[in-house]
Amino acid sequence: MVSETRYATSGEVSIAYRVAGEGPFDIVFVPGSGSHVELAWDLPVPLRAWYERFASFARVIHFDKRGTGMSDAVSPATILETRMDDVRAVMDAAGSERAAVIGLSEGGPMSALFAATYPDRAWALVLWGAMAKETRTADYPWGTDEAETLQAIASIRANLATRPQRLEEAAREACPGGTEEEIKALATLFRNAMSPGAAADLARMNLAIDVRDVLPAIRIPTLVLHNTHDPWVEVGNGRYLGEHISGATYVELPEQGHIPSAATAGPSLDAMEQFLRRAWGAGAWEESEPDRVLATVLFTDIVGSSEHATALGDREWRKTLEQHHELVRRQLVRFRGREVDSWRRLLRQLRRAGTRNSLRVRDLRGGRRARCRTRGGCSG
């Protein structure tokens, strides 16, 4: 039984989700860009076999990432940390305290970031056809070519406007083993997942994906699966994840395609179910104090403080300091951080989109401006 579509609120964005199945634990499914929570269950799309299998032994929470499917549109400037926090918002709305998180494709790095950021909310991680970094660099040769991707982004609108069959071609590329019924259903899902403009915006945002630095902070049971002949996400991406997440189990399947058809999904689904049941049985779900925490440490100080204090005098300088303190406190509340060591040292777990490292304190009445210098860094 699948619930009606519901909405979680993440900041000011509404995130569509559905819940299905029952079981001793929850699974949160984080899809790729081709997502639509209603069509995914109502049409014979290839991944429907996944949802039905997961719902046979667990409670499944499936959502559309912001900018896709039935969720709100997204600003092209939205960073991965903000998008990642949608997972937490959906879990809260669905009443899920802890869950196994399954990330598909570009939902994978979001899931990995969530697991590192919220070790108290995720007890297991499964990554399918995922990547640690989107673009290719000398130290990461498996990513996409940025110039080619930008060229493809520029032609998205024209391609979808003049070649509607392109979506069916994309469905065949993604799922070469699919039946005609599955291919047509998948093309329909792609068509309803995003408008051409939204697809271009999401592709631009994905160019910034790089979670390599957070992988060592993942300390929960992790399974990484990848098809050897994945045409969309080169297999080196999966191998990298398997090598750089501590204790991860890596399973490489000698298959074609990015998405398995219902007929070929058996081995991967068996591996995922066995992994989750085993991790659950071993007590991975039990809460424990994490030995590593992913956090951002932010230091602030007012540039030229001595000169400002002299120029303003004690009373006005105290007002400026109070304005600085209030501004910083508001940012901490906004991003769920906490204050450490008076006003100079601020610590927050990476719970939301990172606080921009440019806070300014203004003396509006006197027309003066004191700049606030910040220094930040991640600690894991």
Segments predicted by a language model, with ranges:
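Conserved HGGG/HGGXW glycine-rich cap/lid loop of the alpha/beta-hydrolase fold
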Residues: 7-70
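Conserved acidic catalytic loop of the alpha/beta-hydrolase fold
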Residues: 81-99
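Flexible "cap/lid" loop of the alpha/beta hydrolase fold
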Residues: 112, 116, 122-158
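Conserved alpha/beta-hydrolase catalytic His-Asp/Glu region
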Residues: 159-205, 214-215
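Short beta-strand/loop motif that positions the catalytic acidic residue
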Residues: 218, 224-226
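Conserved alpha/beta-hydrolase "acid-adjacent" motif
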Residues: 231-237
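Catalytic active-site module of serine/aspartate enzymes centered on a nucleophile-bearing elbow/loop
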Residues: 248-289
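Catalytic NTP-binding/metal-coordinating core of nucleotidyl cyclase/transferase enzymes
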Residues: 285-366, 375
